[in-house]
């Protein structure tokens, strides 16, 4: 994956890469992520992986806002290619807007590689619990492009801050989401119940 990640980085030299992934459907909030790109400087590029019914609408939005050089719809990204995108990105963004997004496992995939996350505070959803605000990333108001952009910049604006979020993301994954940790937690529950 490292070789493929380096190739991806070469495609976007001197850019901060924001990666997002999911079905192109309304509850994923990709229209707000595209809008957020308007508030980011030209040294950012947003890569959105996935297919779905909103593909043409999102492409029209990108073109209408003149963001073709800043936002790329990747289409289907095969599972074997995902590690390269997670390795290559500087940050992962989960812009979902409805509690249909119950957890957002893609956040955990990003954190396992030490990538900070920008996610949304969806009421009655586990998304903002998975991404600890101020530790592994930032959680923002759903449907708010400006807050998405501000959080992306806040995390990546200087190396010291960025490294702290990278370390926090990896630590959050280690403390809560490794397979061993989850098995230990389940066994602990069984022991209490029995």
Regions found by a protein language model. Give the residues of each.
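Conserved acidic donor-binding segment of nucleotide-sugar-dependent glycosyltransferases
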Residues: 132-145, 153-160
